[in-house]
Amino acid sequence: MSEFSQTVPELVAWARKNDFSISLPVDRLSFLLAVATLNGERLDGEMSEGELVDAFRHVSDAFEQTSETIGVRANNAINDMVRQRLLNRFTSEQAEGNAIYRLTPLGIGITDYYIRQREFSTLRLSMQLSIVAGELKRAADAAAEGGDEFHWHRNVYAPLKYSVAEIFDSIDLTQRIMDEQQQQVKDDIAQLLNKDWRAAISSCELLLSETSGTLRELQDTLEAAGDKLQANLLRIQDATMTHDDLHFVDRLVFDLQSKLDRIISWGQQSIDLWIGYDRHVHKFIRTAIDMDKNRVFAQRLRQSVQTYFDDPWALTYANADRLLDMRDEEMALRDDEVTGELPPDLEYEEFNEIREQLAAIIEEQLAIYKTRQTPLDLGLVVREYLAQYPRARHFDVARIVIDQAVRLGVAQADFTGLPAKWQPINDYGAKVQAHVIDKY
């Protein structure tokens, strides 16, 4: 349980005065992890400069760096870590030039995060909760006994402050590491979705089930011990109610209660969020594997799965009936209200007679397309016919050609619902919009 006794300006001035800074590129961080690993294998926890150089040599080889300047670069790295308070250097007058190095609390904290805290262990968590339960019970018994201020400080406040609070912080850190692991699993699933769908399903299910199981183990362990922990905290709180001079204990107990409630609450909320994510991934991946033909939907789904926690989503699909282009074959070819008066050349001729003559000729000529099963492009055919007639007859001839053509068959492209391109059919700006007739 962190408690700051200094204000923000004081902390800023202190950090500036001491020139605190941390800069750890990947090679330097790897060197620090190597030092921590080798240091953990030693009983005395001390390392000589030669051992640090050997560790640096391993890191340098792994990064394929030159070995010619290994001594200079190792010395620079060691001095840099001493300056950043990651290593402590101890020199002796008896062994001049042969310094001893030990990891600082900062160095241990960084390496502990990357090495030890990355692995979740139900047994480790159970042991931590067992220790907390024992400390809280002893503190509660001491609070019930009562005593002077020294008694409260030594037997109640100190165990709560320096044992219970630190273990609560460790459990909170475990939860935050699990949050990072959830994000890593999401990234792994996104990478799997870039591969073959059917091969990805089993891998995704394995990742999802492992994460769900780990979260459930963590929460079950917390809930099993949570009631006892809260009960002992309440015992301590009740004991302080009759003492006006124990505000520091009461405030600490309140902070611990809030921390424990927050840990248990976030554990359950994290499980609920993951269950929702798990359910959606299973449902939509199995649906999408049959729907995805051109990999377009896969790309959108990968992005949606990746950002699910930020933007939750649901899939709704509909199967609408096809839209058919229904033509009235008996529709009158010409409407006086639309076309206006007859051209002068046709003023003294009966329109129906001309229509029948042209229709018979055009029908005979267009029948060749049906006989040969050749696609009929109305744009090209109408343009060829209009080139044979004067401009005054273009409108009527075009209507006749189109009318006869649509009697022969239909265009399969009409069923796609996509509009056809406009094609010019004469030199005066007239255009027609029609798909190629390919089904007779």
Swiss-Prot record:
UniProt-recorded Gene Ontology molecular function terms = calcium ion binding
Specify the domain of life of the species encoding this protein: Bacteria
Query: Is Cytoplasm one of the keywords?
Result: yes
Q: Which UniProt keywords apply?
A: Calcium, Cell cycle, Cell division, Chromosome partition, Cytoplasm, DNA condensation
CC annotations in GO: cytoplasm; nucleoid
**InterPro entries per record:** Chromosome_partition_MukF, MukF_C, MukF_C_sf, MukF_M, MukF_M_sp, MukF_WHTH, WH-like_DNA-bd_sf, WH_DNA-bd_sf
Report the family membership: Belongs to the MukF family.
Q: Which NCBIfam families match?
A: PRK05260.1
Q: Function, please? A: Involved in chromosome condensation, segregation and cell cycle progression. May participate in facilitating chromosome segregation by condensation DNA from both sides of a centrally located replisome during cell division. Not required for mini-F plasmid partitioning. Probably acts via its interaction with MukB and MukE. Overexpression results in anucleate cells. It has a calcium binding activity.
Q: What is this protein called?
A: Chromosome partition protein MukF
- Keyword check for Cell cycle, yes or no: yes
Self-association state and partner proteins as the record states: Interacts, and probably forms a ternary complex, with MukE and MukB via its C-terminal region. The complex formation is stimulated by calcium or magnesium. It is required for an interaction between MukE and MukB.
| Annotated spans, Leucine-zipper | 208-236
Q: Name one Pfam family in it.
A: KicB
Q: Which GO terms describe its biological process?
A: cell division; chromosome condensation; chromosome segregation; DNA replication
- In its UniProt entry, the species of origin is given as Salmonella typhimurium (strain LT2 / SGSC1412 / ATCC 700720)
Q: Which gene encodes it?
A: mukF
Location comes to: Cytoplasm, Nucleoid
